[in-house]
Regions:
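Cysteine-rich micro-motifs
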Residues: 481-487
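Non-ligating segments of multi-cofactor redox enzymes
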Residues: 1-476, 481, 495-524
Length: 524
């Protein structure tokens, strides 16, 4: 006998009830999670490899089965019906419970790994960490750490939720290819390759994770480790530098920051897959936008200052310390970089006019202070640029930004603040790519304002908090530093108003003189 439907909605939103297949799939996934929890208080885990294999397969297959039953048997098309009536996706009780659990997990992961079973002082692992020992020894030859546990679960989450995302957006080729790319880079470059490098006694390195997101790349121990690894280590060092100063700017020029934030980055990969149900929770207010601009660029300044101070502290006055770069050469690199920025601004003065006066003066003041303190430290022969020891500064950055902001808040607050909190307010890599995209990239989202019906879907589902509808209503192209080019705004638009395109960089800053909007054509 069929279940009666008491809803009078024409849209037929999800009623919240599950069919038998969905219940079985969720039960299977829950059993996998239960194995992880049960292993917590255990000393040694018998048959750990068998239990771990069963748990991970249960989580992955259960999640995939639920997604298949939810989306595969319905016509292709995006269905976000009832998201504001679901406790999980509208900051309800379930969302708050999940947020607390995620936040608590990250606190334990970063600061109390012993409660997960991490063995210290040469002791063997116990509990959940011991459960992952067989897989870790298979890949790297070493016992598991809390970071291996986290990386494994992180990868499983992106793969299983990525499969769900592909089913949901299967009619959109751009979303399918983009999500497949994220899944590939997470599994291959972020998980498997670094573990295999460790097995070969080579430095552990995620090739796609570049500075300033990888804030320890220029740490002395990391640089020495790569230099001591021979030719391959030298390749890793040069490739990392090329990613920062050559590969990233070129790709951003042609494709915008989406090439990294939506196609490659692991943080963005988790936000796009596991965080997809929460994208509508991003704050679109003007106040949030102002906080975003100051916060993310302040973190970038902090990262640059911290890195410069750290590198300067371990470089010698000559090459006797084993590095190719001396303090004098570092000072020259800083001066040349700033000179290049000034030259670009002189060539394209229109960019400066688009920046608020307070920001311009603040940036010039910070640059002057950095140059002055660096020159003073070099002339006086001191080892600390900013009159503070560099490693405590580095540790403060790692604690506040690398742990609290990116992990505890960035992922723990998914169900409450949306999936891109870290990307919007704290990621220094997003800040660098955003500046390049805003002023030097060919990428933009074009609008056909005459077709806009002001439904607001684009703004609602923008995970970066951009009020896309306001641009569409005025017929303006969207060129925002924060846009990650996920394409969801174009995908949810019922009228085909938005389109991801490339154009001439000269037309990015200044608006078109003629705007075609909802009220007709107007002259600016």
């Amino acid at each position: 006998m069929s279940r009666s439907d008491h809803s009078l909605s024409i849209a037929a939103p999800h009623s919240g009830t599950l069919d038998g297949s969905q219940k079985i799939a969720l039960a299977v996934a829950s059993m996998g999670v239960l194995v992880l929890f049960v292993s917590l208080p255990m000393g040694t885990v018998p048959h750990a490899g068998l239990w771990l294999t069963g748990a991970l397969l249960a989580i992955a297959l259960g999640g995939a089965g639920y997604a298949w039953r939810t989306y595969a048997h319905h016509p292709a098309g995006i269905k976000n019906n009832g998201v504001w009536h679901n406790g999980l996706t509208s900051r309800g009780a379930v969302a708050w419970v999940l947020g607390v659990l995620l936040t608590g997990f990250y606190v334990v992961l970063y600061f109390y790994p012993q409660y997960l079973g991490l063995g210290g002082d040469g002791k063997a692992n116990t509990g959940t960490v011991a459960l992952f020992d067989p897989l870790s020894r298979l890949l790297s030859g070493n016992a598991a750490s809390q970071w291996f546990v986290y990386g494994t679960l992180y990868t499983v989450a992106i793969l299983s939720m990525g499969f769900k995302f592909i089913l949901k957006y299967r009619h959109n080729k751009y979303e399918v290819v983009r999500t497949t790319s994220v899944m590939f880079f997470q599994l291959g470059f972020a998980f498997l390759i670094p573990e295999l490098l460790a097995r070969l006694s080579l430095p552990y390195d995620d090739f796609k994770n570049m500075w300033p997101l990888n804030y320890y790349f220029f740490d002395e121990w990391n640089v020495k480790g790569m230099l001591d690894a021979g030719g391959f280590g030298l390749f890793m060092l040069l490739f990392g530098v090329a990613m920062i100063f050559l590969i990233s700017p070129i790709l951003t020029y042609f494709y915008g920051k989406r090439w990294y934030c939506s196609w490659v980055c692991g943080c963005g990969g988790l936000a796009e897959t596991a965080g997809d149900p929460f994208r509508q929770l991003s704050d679109k207010s003007l106040k949030a936008w102002k906080i975003e601009r100051w916060a993310v660029h302040s973190v970038l300044v902090f990262a640059v200052v911290m890195t410069a101070a750290l590198v300067y502290s371990y470089l010698g006055g000559d090459s006797a310390k084993g590095f190719w770069v001396t303090r004098g050469m570092l000072l020259g690199i800083i001066v040349l970089t700033l000179g290049f920025v000034v030259a670009v601004l002189l060539i394209r003065p229109g960019m400066v006019k688009e920046v608020h006066k307070a920001v311009r003066y603040g940036a010039m003041g910070i640059l002057a202070v950095i140059i002055g303190l660096t020159a003073y430290a070099y002339i006086s022969g001191g080892s600390d640029i900013f009159f503070v020891q560099s490693y405590p500064l580095r540790n403060a950055y790692g604690f506040a930004i690398g742990a609290i902001f990116s992990g505890v808040v960035g992922v723990g607050f998914y169900p409450l603040l949306g999936s891109r909190v870290w990307c919007r307010f704290g990621c220094p890599m997003a800040a660098v790519l955003g500046l390049q995209q805003r002023f030097f990239s060919r990428f933009r989202i074009t609008t056909n304002g005459g077709q806009c019906i002001s439904c607001g879907n684009c703004s609602t589902y923008c995970e970066m908090g951009i009020d896309v509808r306001s641009y569409a209503q005025r017929g303006e192209s969207i060129v925002r530093a924060s846009c990650v080019g996920c394409g969801i705004c174009a995908a949810v638009c019922p009228r085909g108003v938005l389109k991801l395109e490339n154009g001439k960089p000269s037309g990015l800053v200044s608006s078109d003189p003629i705007a075609i909007g909802r009220t007709g054509a107007t002259l600016r």
